[in-house]
Regions:
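Core catalytic region of metal-dependent phosphoesterases/phosphodiesterases
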Residues: 14-20, 24, 29-124
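Conserved histidine-centered catalytic loops in small-molecule metabolism enzymes
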Residues: 26, 259-260
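Conserved beta-sheet core of the metallophosphoesterase superfamily
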Residues: 110-117, 130, 135, 139-151, ...
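Structural motif
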Residues: 20-21, 52-53, 127-129, 212, ...
Length: 260
């Protein structure tokens, strides 16, 4: 049975399956406007007692890097909410995306989040699910995969750690792409979203044990029943859609957050 320990709080044990699961992705905290961030915090506050598990499928943060002795101030509100959520008994699992793959021990040891190496196959609401953020999965993305391998290497992390956050953060923001998406200067890549959906269909065809394929990255909410009882799910984003998915043993629903 997986076990999560968080410094300064009780140990929490979770069963191998969850009856009610929320999936969210591409929140991009640190770049979305304050009202969007507050909406996501309100969303998290609504979850205790309502669900068993939260899966964050990449790009929770627009940029995340674990320094040895500091955390980024801008993320304190969401880290506090996530820690409180774990304390109520909600299991939180996190897949690193292309913006926040530089995770380390802090999120697990201090917050209580389980970090997943994706692509991975896990159980979500009694369904066998193939889960990945979605970046670098398609044919023709070999150059990106090579670049990703370099920037996620131990040597690159060590070099990046030498730069103080006040210097590195503005540089990262310039190459993020999220500000342009917020301002409407970066259009949705519909062709890539379509190709990722086709990849999901191929996975379901090739792996009959799967009930569900879950991707993020495209920022396009999608729920497709490929064949009876077998689905492709993309939870969308919180830049434009404020969308998420609710999975139970009986159903899968795409929803949009509208706080009262």
């Amino acid at each position: 049975m997986p076990r999560v320990s968080r410094s300064g709080s009780r140990d929490l044990s979770f069963g191998m399956t969850a009856q009610s699961t929320i999936v969210a992705s591409d929140v991009h905290l640190g770049e979305i406007p304050p009202d969007g961030e507050q909406a996501f915090l309100s969303f998290l506050e609504s979850l205790p007692g309502a669900i068993d598990e939260l899966l964050i499928n990449g790009d929770l943060f627009d940029f995340w890097f674990e320094y040895r002795s500091v955390i980024l101030r801008r993320y304190f509100p969401v880290l506090r909410r996530l820690a409180d959520l774990v304390d109520t008994g909600v299991r939180i699992r996190l897949v690193g995306g292309n913006h926040d793959a530089w995770t380390g021990s802090f999120l697990g040891d201090e917050i209580g989040i389980e970090l997943l190496d994706a692509p991975t196959t896990i159980t979500l609401a009694n369904r066998r699910a193939y889960v990945a953020h979605g970046d670098g999965l398609l044919a023709g993305e070999g150059a990106y995969r090579a670049f990703r391998g370099v920037i996620r290497s131990r040597a690159f992390r060590a070099l990046f750690r030498l730069a103080p956050p006040d210097l590195s953060l503005p540089l990262v923001r310039r190459v993020s792409g999220t500000p342009a998406r917020l301002e409407g200067q970066a259009g949705d890549d519909h062709e890539r979203a379509d190709r990722l959906g086709e990849h999901a269909r191929s996975l379901l065809a090739d792996r009959p044990e799967l009930d569900l394929v879950v991707f993020g990255d495209t920022h396009r909410p999608e729920l497709v029943e490929v064949e009876p009882g077998r689905h492709y799910l993309n939870a969308g984003d919180w830049i434009h859609h404020r969308s998420y998915a609710l999975l139970t043993a009986e159903s899968i629903e795409l929803r949009h957050w509208h706080p009262d």
